[in-house]
Amino acid sequence: MFRTLLKSKIHRASVTHCELNYEGSCAIDEDLLDAANLGENEQVHIWNINNGERFITYAIRAERGSRIISVNGSAARRAAVGDLVIIAAFAQVHEEYVAGFRPKLVFVDPDNRIKEERSTIPVQMP
C-alpha cells in the first residue's frame, strides 16, 4: 500500500506577481525550488493564508535569487500581490518507507528569503 505524504513545503511565501494572461502555473525562485526539493512542472498545492483560497497548479522556475513567487493564469484570480501563501507538494510513499520519510520544509521571511529549513513539524500543543 502507498500513502500520500507531504514532500515539500514553502511556508508563508509572499506573492510578488499575479499574471492573469500568462499560461498557468506558479513561478518560484529557483533557490526556493531547490531548498524545498520541488521540480519544474511538479504539481503544487497553493493555500492562500489571506483569503482561504486553495488551488492546484504546477511549478515553473523563476530567476535564481529573484525571490519571485508569481501566481499565473486563471489562478491569478485567487491571489493578490502581497498575499501570504503556503506552497506544498505530496509524494506517494510505499508504507515500508513511511517511518523514515522526511519532508523538506522551507520557512521564508516576508521578502521570501530562506530563514529556516527543517524536516519535521513540531507536535501541536494546546
UniProtKB/Swiss-Prot annotation:
Its cofactor is pyruvate. Binds 1 pyruvoyl group covalently per subunit. CDD domains: Asp_decarbox (cd06919). Catalyzes the pyruvoyl-dependent decarboxylation of aspartate to produce beta-alanine. It comes from Polaromonas sp. (strain JS666 / ATCC BAA-500). It catalyses: L-aspartate + H(+) = beta-alanine + CO2. The active site is at S25, Y58. GO terms for cellular component: cytosol. Is synthesized initially as an inactive proenzyme, which is activated by self-cleavage at a specific serine bond to produce a beta-subunit with a hydroxyl group at its C-terminus and an alpha-subunit with a pyruvoyl group at its N-terminus. Heterooctamer of four alpha and four beta subunits. The modification Pyruvic acid (Ser) is found at S25. SUPFAM superfamilies: ADC-like (SSF50692). Belongs to the PanD family. Pathway: Cofactor biosynthesis; (R)-pantothenate biosynthesis; beta-alanine from L-aspartate: step 1/1. Coiled coil: none annotated. It is found in: Cytoplasm. This is Aspartate 1-decarboxylase 1. It holds the Pfam family Asp_decarbox. One of its GO terms (biological process) is pantothenate biosynthetic process. Its EC number is 4.1.1.11.
